[in-house]
Swiss-Prot record:
It is found in: Cytoplasm. It is an enzyme of class 5 (isomerase). It comes from the Bacteria. The lineage of its organism: Bacteria, Pseudomonadati, Pseudomonadota, Gammaproteobacteria, Lysobacterales. It comes from Stenotrophomonas maltophilia (strain R551-3). GO terms for biological process: gluconeogenesis; glucose 6-phosphate metabolic process; glycolytic process. It catalyses: alpha-D-glucose 6-phosphate = beta-D-fructose 6-phosphate. Catalyzes the reversible isomerization of glucose-6-phosphate to fructose-6-phosphate. InterPro entries: G6P_Isomerase (IPR001672), G6P_Isomerase_C (IPR023096), Phosphoglucose_isomerase_CS (IPR018189), SIS_dom_sf (IPR046348), SIS_PGI_1 (IPR035476), SIS_PGI_2 (IPR035482). This is Glucose-6-phosphate isomerase. One of its GO terms (cellular component) is cytosol. Pathway: Carbohydrate biosynthesis; gluconeogenesis; Carbohydrate degradation; glycolysis; D-glyceraldehyde 3-phosphate and glycerone phosphate from D-glucose: step 2/4. HAMAP family: G6P_isomerase. One of its GO terms (molecular function) is glucose-6-phosphate isomerase activity.
Length: 504
C-alpha cells in the first residue's frame, strides 16, 4: 500500500534492483563499504549489506528533503508542538543536553537538570541508608527503558544496591521478587506518568503492604500530588516528570531513578552524555551523513519499497538481551498508526513488526527461517568490539558468529541439494559499539529514537501519542468488577460466555 507520489521514483529504483544480489551491489560500487558506513562517537554503523544502490539512496534522500525532515528535526529540538493530537512538545532531548538555542528547550533543560540534582541526592541517601535492594514498579515506558539500561550496565560485583523490576499485573511476578528480599532492607519506587495505571497501582499496593507502610517508598510521576496521596509518600520522596516527555522516551528523566540506583549516578549522567552526543549529530549532520536519518530511510526502503513486514534485532552481547523488547515499544507504539497527522488515512504501510533476541542463542531458534524461509526479514545486528569480561576466546567466538551470520544472510550459498541451498539476499545493518559503556548505550538508544521520528515525518504520522492502547484498558476496567462477583452488563456475546466459564 504505497500510492503517495513522493515514492514514485523510488518504486522505479526498487523495480530496477529487483534481481540484484548484495554481492553484485558490492562489486558494482567499489567504495560502497566505506561510503555506506558512518562513525558517530562510540558507534560504527554499516548499511553496505542493504539492497539499495547509490542512485536509490539519493532518491531516498530526495524524499527526506521533500518531506522536510531536517526542519522537522529542528522543530522537535526547539520544543515546538510536534505532538499535535495531544497539543504537546516532545522534549526528551532536553532531558540530556542543551543543544539548541530555543527558549522552550532551554527552560526544559534547566528544569530537568534541577530535578536530576534532586534525584542524585536521593540516590546517595539510599546508598548510605543500609538498604540493600530496591523494587521498581512500573510498566511500559516506566519499566522497559530502566530495566534495559540497568541490566546492560549493572556492575558484575560490588553494586551498592540491587534493583529488581516488576511490571506485569500477574501477582506471580511480585511474589517471586519479594520472596528473595528482606522488607527491612528494601525500598520501593512506583513509576507512573498519570498514577492511574492499573498494573502499577495494584503492584504498588502489594509492595506498600509488604514494606509495612510508605517510609521507604518513592514515586516518579507527572502527577506528583496524586502519587503522594495514593500511598502517603512524603513529598520529598516524589520526583516529577512532565507531559512533554512521552513514556517510551522517559528513561532520561526521573524515570531513570532506578537506573541511577543500579549503576550509580555518575554513570547515569554518562548515559545522558552519550545520548546528547547523538542528539547533536542528528541536529547538525547533513541528511546524507546523518546516522538516524539513514537508519530511518533504510527502514522506509525495506517496508514501503520492498514490502517486508517484519524487522529483527539481534544483539550479540548478552547484556543487551532486553534491547529488542525495548525497541518493540519504542518503534511499534510510536509508528503503529493508520491515520496521518490531519486524521486522514495513511497512503503507505507503516510500522512492521519488530522482534528479536540475543546471539548466539537466536541462531538455534529462529535463524533457520531467516536463512531459508519464504519471508525476507531485514535485521539489525548489534555487537561490541571490546568485552569487559575475562573470557577473550568466548568474545572472539561471539564476534565471529555475528560476522558469519551477516555474511551468510547476504551472500547465501548455492547447492545442488535444494534442502541445503541458501538463497541469500537477506539485508542487514551492522551496528558496532566500541564497548558497552553508558555513553555508547545512550548514543545507541538516541539513534533509534531519532530514526523513529524520521520515519514518522516521512509517513506524516504522530510518533508521540498511543491512543491504540486505551480501548483494551477501558474494557478491562469494566470487566474487573464482573470477575469480582458484581452483576455487570456485558454487551459482547463471546466475553459473556468466557466470563461464565471463568466463574464455574
Amino acid at each position: 500500500m504505497t500510492t503517495n507520489n513522493g515514492f514514485d521514483s523510488l518504486h522505479s529504483h526498487a523495480q530496477r534492483l529487483k534481481g540484484a544480489s548484495i554481492p553484485s551491489l558490492l562489486a558494482a560500487e567499489p567504495g560502497r563499504v566505506q561510503e555506506l558506513a558512518l562513525r558517530v562517537g562510540p558507534l560504527y554503523v554499516s548499511f553496505a549489506r542493504q539492497t539499495y544502490d547509490a542512485a536509490a539512496l539519493q532518491a531516498l534522500l530526495a524524499l527526506a528533503a521533500e518531506r522536510d525532515v531536517g526542519a522537522a528535526i529542528t522543530r522537535l529540538f526547539r520544543g515546538e508542538q510536534v505532538n499535535l493530537t495531544e497539543g504537546r512538545a516532545a522534549l526528551h532531548t532536553a532531558l540530556r543536553g542543551d543543544v539548541v538555542d530555543a527558549p522552550v528547550a532551554a527552560e526544559a533543560y534547566a528544569t530537568a537538570r534541577d530535578i536530576r540534582q534532586r534525584m542524585g541526592v536521593l540516590v546517595r541517601a539510599l546508598e548510605d541508608s543500609g538498604v540493600t535492594d530496591v523494587v521498581s514498579v512500573g510498566i511500559g515506558g516506566s519499566d522497559l527503558g530502566p530495566r534495559l539500561v540497568a541490566d546492560a550496565l549493572r556492575p558484575v560485583t560490588g553494586a551498592r544496591l540491587r534493583v529488581h523490576f516488576v511490571s506485569n499485573v500477574d501477582g506471580a511476578a511480585m511474589q517471586r521478587t519479594l520472596a528473595t528480599l528482606d522488607p527491612a532492607k528494601t525500598a520501593g519506587i512506583l513509576i507512573s506518568k498519570t498514577f492511574g495505571t492499573q498494573e502499577t497501582l495494584l503492584n504498588g499496593q502489594i509492595l506498600h503492604d509488604w514494606l509495612g507502610g510508605s517510609e521507604r517508598l518513592y514515586a516518579v510521576s507527572a502527577n506528583p500530588e496524586r502519587a503522594a496521596k495514593a500511598f502517603a509518600i512524603a513529598a520529598d520522596r516524589v520526583l516529577p516528570m512532565w507531559d512533554w516527555v512521552g513514556g517510551r522516551y522517559s528513561l532520561w528523566s526521573a524515570v531513570g531513578f532506578p537506573i541511577a540506583l543500579a549503576i550509580g549516578f555518575e554513570r547515569f549522567e554518562q548515559l545522558l552524555e552519550g545520548a546528547a552526543q547523538m542528539d547533536a549529530h542528528a541536529l547538525d549532520a547533513p541528511l546524507e551523513r546523518n546516522l538516524p536519518v539513514l537508519h530511518g530511510l533504510t527502514d522506509i526502503w525495506n517496508r514501503n519499497l520492498l514490502g517486508y513486514a517484519t524487522h529483527a534485532v539481534m544483539t550479540y552481547d548478552q547484556r543487551l538481551a532486553l534491547l529488542p523488547a525495548y525497541l518493540q515499544q519504542l518503534v511499534m507504539e510510536s509508528l503503529g498508526k493508520r491515520v496521518q497527522r490531519d486524521g486522514q488515512p495513511v497512503t503507505t504501510d507503516t510500522v512492521p513488526v519488530w522482534w528479536g533476541g540475543a546471539g548466539t542463542d537466536v541462531q538455534h531458534s529462529f535463524f533457520q527461517a531467516l536463512h531459508q524461509g519464504t519471508s525476507i526479514i531485514p535485521a539489525d545486528f548489534i555487537g561490541c568490539v571490546h568485552n569487559d569480561d575475562p573470557y577473550t576466546i568466548n568474545h572472539q567466538a561471539l564476534l565471529a558468529n555475528l560476522l558469519a551470520q551477516t555474511e551468510a544472510l547476504a551472500n547465501g550459498q548455492g547447492s545442488d541439494d535444494p534442502h541445503r541451498d541458501y538463497p541469500g539476499g537477506r539485508p542487514s545493518t551492522l551496528i558496532l559499539l566500541d564497548a558497552l559503556t553508558p555513553q555508547a548505550l545512550g548514543a545507541l538508544i538516541a539513534m533509534y529514537e531519532h530514526a523513529v521520528y524520521v520515519q514518522s515525518v516521512i509517513w506524516n504520522i504522530n510518533a508521540f501519542d498511543q491512543f491504540g492502547v486505551e480501548l483494551g484498558k477501558q474494557l478491562a476496567s469494566g470487566l474487573l468488577p464482573a470477575l469480582q462477583g458484581e452483576d455487570v452488563a456485558v454487551a459482547d456475546l463471546m466475553t459473556r460466555e468466557i466470563l461464565a466459564q471463568l466463574k464455574r
